Amino acid sequence: MSKTITSSGISQPIVFFGTEEHSLIALRGLVEAGLPVAAVVTKPDAAKGRGKKLTAPAVKVYAETHNIPVWQPTRLKEITEDIQKLDNPVGVLVSYGKIIPKKTLELFTPGIINVHPSLLPKYRGPSPIESAIVNRDNKTGVTIMCLVSAMDAGPIYQQVPYALDFTETKPELYDTLFTLGTNLLVSKLPAILSGELQPIPQNDSEATYCALLSKEDGNLDLTTLTPGEAEARVRAYLGYPRTRATIGNHTIII
């Protein structure tokens, strides 16, 4: 099969994995940079809102408007043959929302490249942005790494730090870090694919972890939290899980 050289100089077809709203930042960045996105893998349409209306992920809508094939497997092995039909594909993953099995990882060269919004090995897990705000860190950042079976434990291609001024909200920081990560990915992808940029293993002894958030995380106990701690949670949990506090007989949504 012949390869098409794009304006980016990259010929390997890209399979993009992503589901969340901010996954669209990365997909759009790849497409607008002229990179050869051959397919988008996302979760099946899901019921959302009070009316439980079946809603497509934003990346699916975007891909369809740009004539990019969309794959929505319930299990990734369902698309193995589709991936194998591509000529030496590379994977890019941004908040797909499912664990990628080893057999799927092995279908890609040099693997699946992941954009993670923290300075790994700090904050491995699903809530690094919220954790940085809640803990009132003075900096965070973004990492592009090679995906492995263990959560966020793969070797690192590049990182970019980002200073925090203790005013950031969750939605703002999501947009900022995933835009930063997308720009980093686009700029470094040629060097990654050529082998010029080699990943460096993480120091597992320095790893810290963050958990999946639940609605209960938004409950503010104003008798134990300092004003600064409460304010940080309000900024970190804006949108979901949203913060609430009980004052007297009233529960206030903040």
Where are these regions (language model features)?
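Short amphipathic alpha-helix with an adjacent loop that forms part of the alpha/beta core around
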Residues: 77-87, 106
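N-terminal Rossmann-like dinucleotide-binding module
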Residues: 2-50
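N-terminal beta-loop-helix "entrance" segment that forms/cooperates
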Residues: 46-64
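Internal anion-binding site segments
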Residues: 2, 204-254
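Short, well-ordered alpha-helical microsegments
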Residues: 23-25, 79-80, 100-102
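Donor/substrate-binding cores of folate-linked one-carbon enzymes
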Residues: 12-13, 33-36, 90-209
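Short acidic-hydrophobic, aromatic-tinged amphipathic segments that line or gate anion-handling sites
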Residues: 70-75
